[in-house]
């Protein structure tokens, strides 16, 4: 069934028509004047992920399992396939927000390696390691480096049920001395071969799945600790990013979504007045 969001005024009517099988939509603006009518149709989505009621319900379930008290800091990890693989692992274990430290303004990920996970995980970019570490410590996180040292903890013995941020370093040099100095400790993956390190994407996957194992045993995936208003905001931005951008630009609240993920009300400004779209 095609759902239509209608905004009506005496001289202007706006419809938002989501295509039911793909996340594609149109803003259809009809201006009515005596003796004539003009129509302006604006395509706001060209290619998006499929949006069906089942996919919307799946997204809600995913958010209920999110682990906001577990995150990753990628320090100068620049290779696109490594970035994508780490973020894919984060999404798989329920991490919805990660941090990256780099002087490069824009990250490039290989979509094949990410398998679309970049859409579902928010990336916070920091220019300095100290900025990221201090922010997370202020939020109550314990910060630990994936780094070999004499006092490093075997990742299988580390308590991942605590509020934890893991720092993974660059492909060639690992984590920086600055990161080691700022962190609360180091965690290692025991190695029995000639080499003393794993690829960053492999190391992160091993540690994150150990974290998932511990948290699942502790029942932490059933907590549902993300507040409802935050969940509603994230869902709207996931499935209607262009409309969300329009709302943010014009200071408008997001329209409510119904149980199937369709917009259930017209767009309104902060004073409650119905707004017309360009």
Where are these regions (language model features)?
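Alpha-helical interaction segments
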Residues: 6, 16-17, 228-229
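Post-transcriptional modification and biogenesis factors for structured RNAs
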Residues: 35, 39-278
